Amino acid sequence: HLTTPAVRMLLMTSSESVIDVLRSAYLEELETVMNYRTNSIVLEGVRAQEIKESLEADIAEELGHAGELGQRLKQLDANPPGSAAFTAQQESLQPPADSTDVLAVIDGVLDAEDGAISTYQQLVELARAADDPVTEDLAVEILADEEAHRSEFRGLRKEYSGD
């Protein structure tokens, strides 16, 4: 189809924004994996087991998301970032000083999921604006996973805060 130079420029700018957010999301997923792994190791106590198991299960899914995002970047003729591009962001997901503080970890997970949901909502909009239905579909798929994780941990939050 025919596009004007202004429309082509807008689509190019939109495509660059899509790539920027894909790269950011890729790094966020890997940071989440690091923090989930650390918390699944550090947490202890009778109450911690369910949370540790949930974090362990989510690690594989988050790694899968990173893989999908990296592949999409490659398809767009861009590369996923290396570790030199990484700046830690997830302060609330750092291991708690008290290794039995299950609620601190749950709250950190909820913060991380809220951040991921925001990122994927932004990616959906940018991909739509860039006329990139493949990235839009990927973002919607991952968004659904992140919303499911948030729902799971909201339930755990209710359960553990009621003790």
Outline where the language-model segments fall:
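Iron-associated oxidoreductase/ferritin-like identity signal
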Residues: 1-163
